[in-house]
């Protein structure tokens, strides 16, 4: 079984995880297709992953022992058996189309067939909370670079270079934009609505983030404050650092939202602050799972002063008790020796005091 080169895996992963911005309360369905040529190892490897909102629900891999479109979400068990046969055939047909596309791109770019190349597409549709269509897209890439894309109006194409203009002319003559627009505005929306109904307990839930702020000294003069949001769903979230109530957008390092591995997501935002001014900075967290936005600050660890005072007081108390015991013993000894004359302290008396000192920590 051949393997996808690391660079291509990163491209595929970037496509799957760099989620397109969506409107609050909206839903989306997205597919990512990747074909990778591997000279001398047979047919190109072809992979499909499909997402509803931020949940992967189907996958196809031509390198599987028995290549079939596979279920990736529990709620997909509700579809009829013939669904999987139909989707598997579509995937296999598309794999052959992409094989041809790879060969065509080699000619357009005047490249040798000896190297490995990739051809990818991502497409999808988005609907409002009430199910109405409001956005669709379809984009293609070759060897990790933009190739051609359907414009926002879904009626025309934009080619990234002169090689892609060959494809643009061919597709314009064949009316490909109209065919894709019909799919995105109607069939894609119908399937998305159906999937949302089947998986509503998962897809339409709102898990609030668990948020906190960590402190990382960078130097004697500066420290990094990092605001964490963990375990939230859906993926849409806002993390904003403020200084004295003013947004610090330009000075904030913000990572892309990442899967947490358990069906939820993670994200953090960091800002570098002058040491000693940490309390002037607050992190504002907004997510649909929260009844109201969270406002967080860094909480310095509790100072050990109280603990030290308690230890010192305890030691002093022990010394006072020992001193009182020694005084009582001496008085009793003095009384017993008084019958025969003056009391003379024993030679080892100061060693008792020395023994008392040894109890000090």
Swiss-Prot record:
Transmembrane segments: 309-329
Protein origin, superkingdom: Eukaryota
Annotated SUPFAM superfamilies: Immunoglobulin, MHC antigen-recognition domain
Keywords, sorted A to Z: Disulfide bond, Glycoprotein, Immunity, Membrane, MHC I, Phosphoprotein, Signal, Transmembrane, Transmembrane helix
Signal peptide: 1-24
SMART domains reported for this sequence: IGc1 (SM00407)
Location in or out of the cell: Membrane
GO biological process, one term: antigen processing and presentation of endogenous peptide antigen via MHC class I via ER pathway, TAP-independent
Gene Ontology cellular-component annotations: external side of plasma membrane; extracellular space; lumenal side of endoplasmic reticulum membrane; MHC class I protein complex; phagocytic vesicle membrane
Glycosylation sites: 110
Cysteines paired by S-S bonds: 125-188, 227-283
Record has Glycoprotein as a keyword: yes
UniProt membrane topology term: Single-pass type I membrane protein
Annotated region (Alpha-2), positions in chain: 115-206
GO molecular function (one): signaling receptor binding
Phosphoserine modifications at: 355, 358
Stored InterPro entries: Ig-like_dom (IPR007110), Ig-like_dom_sf (IPR036179), Ig-like_fold (IPR013783), Ig/MHC_CS (IPR003006), Ig_C1-set (IPR003597), MHC_class-I_related (IPR050208), MHC_I-like_Ag-recog (IPR011161), MHC_I-like_Ag-recog_sf (IPR037055)
Description of how the protein assembles with itself and partners: Heterodimer of an alpha chain and a beta chain (beta-2-microglobulin).
Function field: Involved in the presentation of foreign antigens to the immune system.
Family (UniProt): Belongs to the MHC class I family.
Protein name: RLA class I histocompatibility antigen, alpha chain 19-1
